[in-house]
């Protein structure tokens, strides 16, 4: 996966949407492709706002819970080293990436949104780690 693929996903919702490489606050050891706010030159039109609400790109933001957990994993690698780790509802994949960086035997990003799995894959590659992807944990 690449930034181009993620940009294509974003543009399904917001025509001017794109990703940029970011390092989330509190977890600067991980780089992620996230929504680039510089594309917003003003307020969203009514149609754009409706599209964002109808099909939100949750994966294009790094949620605080993921940032905190990823940082904790990197600070405490012994908890995941050599183990199989599941990042359930992975979104950007930050927790799976952190687990892989911390030495997990396998880090699995699981999300029902195919675009989120593309984001997790792209973010793993950006950080030089390998993760597994799972669309449905049944």
List where the protein language model places each region.
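Generic detector of short, locally flexible boundary/turn motifs and exposed helical patches
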Residues: 1, 34-36, 50-53, 112-118
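N-terminal auxiliary segments of SAM/dcSAM-dependent transferases
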Residues: 1-41
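Domain-scale activation on soluble regions of proteins
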Residues: 9, 45-47, 88
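SAM-dependent Rossmann-like transferase core, predominantly class I methyltransferases
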Residues: 25-80
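Conserved SAM/SAH cofactor-binding pocket of Class I
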Residues: 65, 71-137
